[in-house]
């Protein structure tokens, strides 16, 4: 009987590769969540991660850019009223967090000709859309910024206003992002949080993509920002204003 002498070597090599490429128990397991988060079974539209009793929703992503830019959005959401109530000054520096396709970014840029708008998003594809628009519109005061799930990548104490429109509920790390927003705001600066009203069953949006005023204030107040007021000016959304103490 002929024996292939190379076979034992091949088998040994294969075995060693299997052994040394297997993940160890420590690397195979995910790092435990910080105490302020809880992991539970996920619902259809959530990620199974909870913050202050709220399940965090899945992210819409760049495939939803068309919905953000839909022709009927202004009439449905009265985005014109939203922008008017920001009461911006021409030299304000604004951070549009979760900027998406830049729907608000470029509208804001027109109102702050001596200021700047930081369009922050974690999606390179969304930022690609914004960069293309910036060139087309020659919006020199728009700065696209690639953020992370925990950082804005904006200098501390540098912006007068942070705007988040229907984005906060998707943040996978809301506490860390809230802390980052606090750091980015100048003393006296404001955060305007826009979220679909959880309290209104007639708002035709999935549950996890809505937030109640009470829950929103609870979460944002944990950052050190102070709730100032909630304006009842939009047909479907809360317009909540927070400020950073001087």
Predicted features along the sequence, with ranges:
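Class I SAM-dependent methyltransferase SAM/SAH-binding core
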Residues: 95-151
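Class I SAM-dependent transferase core
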Residues: 30-87, 93
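A short SAM/SAH-binding and catalytic strip from SAM-dependent methyltransferases
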Residues: 160-174
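Core SAM-dependent methyltransferase catalytic element
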Residues: 228-229, 233-246
């Amino acid at each position: 009987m002929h024996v292939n002498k190379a076979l034992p070597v091949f088998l040994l090599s294969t075995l060693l590769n299997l052994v040394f490429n297997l993940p160890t128990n420590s690397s195979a397991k995910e790092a435990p969540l910080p105490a302020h988060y809880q992991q539970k079974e996920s619902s259809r539209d959530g990620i199974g991660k909870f913050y202050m009793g709220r399940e965090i929703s899945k992210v819409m992503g760049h495939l939803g850019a068309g919905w953000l830019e839909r022709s009927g959005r202004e009439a449905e959401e009265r985005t014109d009223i939203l922008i008017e109530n920001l009461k911006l000054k021409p030299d304000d520096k604004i951070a549009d967090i979760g900027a998406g396709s830049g729907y608000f970014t470029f509208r804001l840029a027109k109102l702050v000709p001596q200021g700047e708008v930081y369009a922050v998003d974690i999606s390179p594809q969304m930022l690609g859309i914004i960069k293309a628009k910036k060139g087309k519109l020659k919006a020199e005061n728009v700065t696209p910024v690639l953020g992370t799930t925990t950082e804005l990548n904006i200098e501390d104490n540098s912006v007068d206003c942070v705007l988040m429109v229907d984005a906060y509920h998707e943040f996978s790390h809301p506490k860390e992002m809230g802390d980052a927003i606090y750091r980015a705001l100048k003393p006296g600066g404001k955060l305007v949080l826009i979220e679909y009203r959880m309290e209104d069953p007639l708002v035709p949006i999935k549950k996890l993509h809505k937030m109640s005023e009470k829950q929103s204030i609870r979460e944002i107040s944990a950052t050190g920002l102070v709730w100032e007021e909630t304006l009842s000016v939009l047909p479907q959304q809360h317009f909540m204003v927070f400020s950073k103490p001087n």
